[in-house]
Amino acid sequence: MTLEWNIDDKFHLFFRKKRSVYIVGGVHHDEDEVDPKVVAQSGLQGDDGVVRLPPLNTLVNFLGHVSPYMHADYAFLHREWEYNRTASFADDLVNLPSVYDWRYVYPRDDEETKRKKRYIMPPDNQYLCGSCWAVSTASAIGDAYVVAGLVDWRPDISPAWALTCYPQGQCEGGSPALLLKEISQGNGIVSNHCLDYSFCASNPRCNGAAANHFGAENLSELVPKSCGCYVGDSMHYRYTVDPLIRTLAIGVGTVTEENIQSTIKRHILTHGPVLAGYFVLKNFTSGYFTRINGGVYFDRGNYIPGQALVFNDHYCSGDSYRGSHAVAIIGWGVARNVLYDTDKRGDVPYWYCRNSWRSTWGGDDGYFKMAMYPWNRVAQFEKLVTLRDRDNVPHRCGGIITFTVSTKPVKVKMNQLNTTLLPFPLLRDRSWYGGDQEEYRPAIVPKLAPSDGPNKPPLPLPVYYSALDLALLVLPALLIVIVVLIGKIPT
């Protein structure tokens, strides 16, 4: 149960102007007041004291690069289900579980599935580079290898390799669909042991928490200029993906509102996380929504610390547009008895997503819940939508990408970069880059899922008033009572 205490009367607004409002964890990236302690806790504040957010992708476009989902693809997925009938999900061929994800362990999971969940990637950090398209794709490829049983370790796939060898817009954005296609047709992709994110993570120009109001410079010039590893003549695993890469979006191909969500769920259960694109709005960026109302993001919510949660179309209009973003969907669930409109409650289905704004973003260790379509109609995954920004420029986003892997990674000798020309120090000792560590098996044991799916403890009650505030509020009432009592004293 989530506790909420909203005080929006005139007295509160008066006192709010006089002192900061303390909300645990919520960070507001507008002109509104926030407590400095909250900003510090958020992980979004750079060493210079400036609150920053990652630059958002303007090139997330899943159309035109890969084919839409068709009847043959449903048949293929059905055959995969049939093949896995002896697995722990066999009884869900028709009835899918209402809650499932690759982060937590559920009672239905067998020992093999529990072991695989140890190797699923946690949220990464793209820093100031607009590389969500590369970071989310790299993590999903590694997950796919784990779920397919092709590796018995965490692959730790390299986003830097994607930015270098399949550059697209590099730090200005790109399409996960096109990246997957190029990986399947090219020379694959390697792990961070070959080429990691040092170009950004160890460079002061890039390793801030993100750009203030998304006003980051284009940092593509920092990306290595040619494919290769930091250490030459070293053996590294090369991973690839199958050519079967598909777009899922309502109204595209044979995808409908009736079949899209069940198809996505079955793919996640069978093959692992999928990739999704969506519009990021002003009310999303702070991650404050992850801490209230079941943690589900509704694009019509205000999500302003210190104010009652209300819903209005203004919050998902073009004036609120911030950019487009790509993330991995790792599961789904149902939030029980949450507000989905002003003064309206109910059970709302959501997608459980892994962001790339580091694990300190939001209140769920870098993960978040996105209300499914049609609960959200602008910031959502299932439908391609067009949104015009405040300058009347149209933007199009939405859709989900599915893919599969079926070939074990192969160790190959890689070329060496000229590290003397690199404008940054490496994150780790040189020996770490000397070859892949297939024995990389994190000791972290996945936690049991809460009964209602991924959730965080409720927020402590926000502290809006000091003792002086309360005294000033109560004093007038006491004076009135005293006057009334004096008036009743017999003369």
UniProtKB/Swiss-Prot annotation:
| BP GO annotations | proteolysis
| EC code(s) of this entry | 3.4.22.-
As for subcellular location, the record says: Membrane
- Matching InterPro entries, A to Z? Papain-like_cys_pep_sf, Pept_cys_AS, Pept_his_AS, Peptidase_C1A, Peptidase_C1A_C
Superkingdom to which the source organism belongs: Viruses
| Keywords, sorted A to Z | Hydrolase, Membrane, Protease, Thiol protease, Transmembrane, Transmembrane helix
- Tell me how this protein sits in the membrane: Single-pass membrane protein
MF terms in GO: cysteine-type peptidase activity
Q: Name one Pfam family in it.
A: Peptidase_C1
Principal location: membrane
Catalytic site residues? Answer: 132, 325, 355
Q: Which family does it belong to?
A: Belongs to the peptidase C1 family.
PANTHER family hit by this protein: CYSTEINE PROTEASE FAMILY C1-RELATED (PTHR12411)
Q: What does this chain do?
A: Probable cysteine protease.
The protein's name is: Probable cysteine proteinase 024R
Species per Swiss-Prot/TrEMBL record:
Invertebrate iridescent virus 3
